[in-house]
Amino acid sequence: MAGAAEDVRVLFGAAVRAALEAWPALQIAVENGFGGVHSQEKAEWLGGAVEDYFIANADLELEEIEDFLGELMTTEFDTVVEDGSLPQVSQQLQTMFHHFQKGDGAALQEMTSQINQKKCKVTATPLMTAKETDVAEDDVDSVEEMEVTATNDGATTDEVCPQPQPSDPDTQTIKEEDIVEDGWTIVRRKK
């Protein structure tokens, strides 16, 4: 019986790692070195840390999982996840843990397989826009934006990777009058 429990634990660990590897926020943080020169090692460590967190805390609420993942992303990768994916990943991990607790290795294998089939490769490419603030000084301020594109990672699937869409294009762009002379950007509250 202990062998079956160990097998399910291994499947749970693999499912957790698959979910984290497919998480676009973590992919971007690793690819752009937000965690420093050891970003890839931190991402691998993150899988084990999340697995251990679930094992040590048997009855976790969704908010606790979100807080834990958000804290790890902030401390290890200097990244605040604001794309709405944190609750989705947390829910997915919580479902995996429930399957682990029931000893349902088949469900864990199925979830891992589905994640690997749908896995998208996300890349962030910088877009540079420049605005002259003072013609006499020839001083140019630039605002760097990131364009996120999703490409299939070679998996054979007919599904299309969803592109993140801004909720309101007018609120997402930095208006010219919001950039003042000294390079600061004025942030306005939504109305």
UniProtKB/Swiss-Prot annotation:
Coiled coil: none annotated. One of its GO terms (biological process) is rRNA processing. The keyword rRNA processing applies. Residues 140-175 are annotated as: Disordered. Keywords: rRNA processing. InterPro entries: Pre-rRNA_process_TSR2 (IPR019398). It holds the Pfam family WGG. May be involved in 20S pre-rRNA processing. Belongs to the TSR2 family. This is Pre-rRNA-processing protein TSR2 homolog. It comes from Mus musculus. The lineage of its organism: Eukaryota, Metazoa, Chordata, Craniata, Vertebrata.
